[in-house]
Amino acid sequence: MEIRKENVDVVIVGGGPAGLAAAVRLYEQGIRDILILERETHLGGILRQCIHDGFGLTRFKTTLSGPEYAQRFIDQVKELGIPYVTDTTVLEVSRGKVVTAVSSGGLVQWQAKAVILTMGCRERTRGALGIPGERPTGVFTAGVAQAYMNLYNRMPAK
């Protein structure tokens, strides 16, 4: 398999609120060669499932729900023309700032001058943490339960 190779000034790993804010701030500081890499299909990260309000008071001077707050940043990224790639999983970031990722288009390596890691929080299962035991059917992490209710309008385990 051939690996496509590209150069970019800054690679931002993670298209959630921190990654989007970092991209916008870099652009405001005059840095234009930026690339956001996001594992999920949509930008916005955890904010997409935080339907309560209370976001945005500091940055946007108004209270917003999580999806509204994320959309403000997404709109800024699009308006500024900052490139992003979704459905892309970063496999490795080398000491030499080479970011290797895979997507449906295959393997890509970006040689960056700087890499910003903004992967946010991600719940890990008991097994991923190496805690022995069994997990009964119908037991969900808080994040999974929240996603079922707020993103998919379904009650967990129904």
Question: Each PLM stretch: what is its role?
Answer:
Residues 8-68, 157-158:
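Beta1-alpha1 glycine-rich phosphate/pyrophosphate-binding loop at the start
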Residues 1-13, 71-157:
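FAD-binding core/adjacent interface of flavoenzyme oxidoreductases
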